[in-house]
């Protein structure tokens, strides 16, 4: 499976700017991710932007603040229409042609280097693939394993995560985060089994449909922490399923799940796809030094080891 983030999209458009016709004076975003791509491209190229329905209806497009004159926007002479994938490109070309609008059709990610109806493909990216801007709409959700906290809702704060009254309040009032538009195959959470009723109630209130809810069957939060069961439980549930993807909020757990299951994990903290191959190429980052450790390192650099040692002896008295 291939994954592309919004950062990947922006980088590709930046690197491909020289491939866009120089005479472009209007960028049109085709429905879906094409609108996002067009927004980025019009800012990079410093030209106005419109959407497909607006230009077909003859509505004027907005002029960017960087335009030198303040008069009305002139009729576009060279239109570039952008889609994130090939879906709908042929239809868009036909509709633009029927309206007498000549346009260069750009597909950001095509199945191959050539796409019917497109003049330019920026990157060949075969299926299966998933994008940051549409992962909660992707058909893979119907078979995927998905975390709850940090994905469907915000993580509890330290104060809320007390395994008591504050946590019960969190479970019923958690703020929604990413909203799926499809039924999720399996929800896999390290929430304790004793909180199933509250979890199911919140999911129902949010209108989130799913096939199965897997929860950690341990007596307490303290026992869960003692066993370090978060990642291993999720990994084993994922490994035993036929799910092709796990969506996890936290990088450390995503790496653990990918390592133990041998299957890909979409990490929302880094917006990257974690696999055994990526783990082999990029070992885990070194722990971030503590504030005290950082201060000591700065002091040694500024004062030198001898003066730092002298100060330590002085204040130890």
Regions found by a protein language model. Give the residues of each.
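PRPP-associated nucleotide enzymes
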Residues: 1-144, 153-157, 164-175, 201, ...
């Amino acid at each position: 499976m291939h994954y592309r983030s919004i950062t990947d999209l922006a980088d590709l458009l930046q690197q491909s700017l020289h491939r866009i016709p120089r005479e472009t004076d209007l960028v049109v975003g085709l429905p879906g991710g094409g609108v996002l791509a067009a927004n980025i491209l019009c800012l990079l190229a410093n030209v106005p932007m419109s959407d497909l329905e607006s230009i077909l209806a003859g509505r004027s497009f907005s002029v960017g603040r960087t335009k030198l004159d303040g008069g009305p926007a002139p009729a576009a002479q060279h239109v570039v229409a952008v889609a994130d994938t090939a879906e709908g490109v042929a239809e868009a070309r036909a509709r633009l042609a029927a309206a007498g609008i000549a346009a260069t059709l750009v597909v950001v990610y095509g199945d191959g280097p050539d796409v019917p109806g497109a003049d330019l493909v920026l990157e060949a990216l075969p299926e299966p693939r998933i994008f940051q801007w549409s992962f909660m709409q992707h058909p893979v959700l119907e078979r995927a394993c998905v975390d709850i906290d940090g994905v469907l809702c915000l993580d509890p704060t330290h104060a809320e995560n007390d395994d008591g009254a504050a946590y019960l309040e969190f479970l019923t009032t958690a703020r929604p985060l990413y909203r799926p538009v499809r039924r999720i195959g399996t929800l896999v959470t390290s929430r304790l089994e004793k909180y199933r009723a509250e979890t199911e109630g919140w999911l129902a209130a949010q209108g989130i449909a799913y096939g199965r809810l897997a929860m950690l069957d341990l007596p307490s939060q303290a026992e869960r922490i003692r066993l370090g069961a978060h990642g291993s439980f999720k990994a084993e549930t994922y490994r035993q399923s036929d799910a092709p993807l796990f969506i996890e909020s936290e990088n450390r757990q995503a790496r653990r799940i990918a390592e133990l299951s041998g299957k890909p994990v979409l990490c929302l903290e880094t917006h990257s796809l974690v696999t055994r191959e990526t783990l082999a190429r990029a070992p885990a980052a070194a722990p971030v030094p503590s504030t005290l450790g950082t201060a000591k390192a700065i002091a040694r650099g500024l004062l030198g080891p001898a003066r730092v040692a002298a100060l330590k002896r002085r204040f130890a008295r």
